[in-house]
């Protein structure tokens, strides 16, 4: 399971010209599900995302996690993160989870974060989305479990 996280001062997702999810300070999470992923991996990754210290403390050091910084999450499903780009000029998605598996783990990821008290907005699974963000830093990390 893969989470590409970006520290943002704001981010939003638009589907059919309507904003369906938006946050101010927080993390934009692009979430990719691979075939071997399961609930245990999902919980481990969600915990890591919420606990990862990417926000600056009073000394300007990346020392605060999402909750400590008072941030929110915007979680967007992104199957292309599971692409194999090692050969040729066209990505292969054979390692990506099935749509049913990915939807279940995506929904579980969001529910798990909300259950921890984190304000969590979402995109729309499987939709053609327009994602807008102001990357703060920029600060971007590729987390995998």
From Swiss-Prot:
GO terms for cellular component: cytoplasm. Its main location: cytoplasm. Its EC number is 3.1.1.96. It catalyses: glycyl-tRNA(Ala) + H2O = tRNA(Ala) + glycine + H(+); a D-aminoacyl-tRNA + H2O = a tRNA + a D-alpha-amino acid + H(+). Gene3D superfamilies: D-tyrosyl-tRNA(Tyr) deacylase. It is an enzyme of class 3 (hydrolase). Keywords: Cytoplasm, Hydrolase, RNA-binding, tRNA-binding. GO terms for biological process: D-amino acid catabolic process. GO terms for molecular function: D-tyrosyl-tRNA(Tyr) deacylase activity; Gly-tRNA(Ala) deacylase activity; Ser(Gly)-tRNA(Ala) hydrolase activity; tRNA binding. Transmembrane segments: none annotated. A motif (Gly-cisPro motif, important for rejection of L-amino acids) lies at residues 137-138. It is found in: Cytoplasm. It comes from the Bacteria. Belongs to the DTD family. Homodimer. An aminoacyl-tRNA editing enzyme that deacylates mischarged D-aminoacyl-tRNAs. Also deacylates mischarged glycyl-tRNA(Ala), protecting cells against glycine mischarging by AlaRS. Acts via tRNA-based rather than protein-based catalysis; rejects L-amino acids rather than detecting D-amino acids in the active site. By recycling D-aminoacyl-tRNA to D-amino acids and free tRNA molecules, this enzyme counteracts the toxicity associated with the formation of D-aminoacyl-tRNA entities in vivo and helps enforce protein L-homochirality. A Gly-cisPro motif from one monomer fits into the active site of the other monomer to allow specific chiral rejection of L-amino acids. NCBIfam families: D-aminoacyl-tRNA deacylase. This is D-aminoacyl-tRNA deacylase. It comes from Shewanella sp. (strain ANA-3). The gene is dtd.
């Amino acid at each position: 399971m893969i989470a590409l996280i970006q520290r943002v001062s704001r981010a939003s997702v638009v589907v059919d010209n309507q904003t369906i999810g938006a946050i101010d300070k927080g993390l934009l999470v692009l979430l990719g599900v691979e075939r071997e992923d399961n609930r245990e991996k999902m919980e481990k990754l969600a915990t890591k995302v919420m606990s990862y210290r990417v926000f600056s403390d009073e000394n300007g050091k990346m020392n605060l996690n999402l909750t400590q910084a008072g941030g929110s999450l915007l979680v967007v499903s992104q199957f292309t993160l599971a692409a194999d780009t090692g050969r040729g000029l066209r990505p292969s998605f054979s390692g990506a989870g099935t749509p049913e598996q990915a939807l279940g783990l995506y929904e579980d990821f969001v529910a798990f974060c909300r259950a921890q008290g984190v304000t969590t907005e979402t995109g729309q699974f499987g939709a053609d989305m327009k994602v807008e963000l102001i990357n703060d830093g920029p600060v971007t990390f590729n987390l995998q479990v």
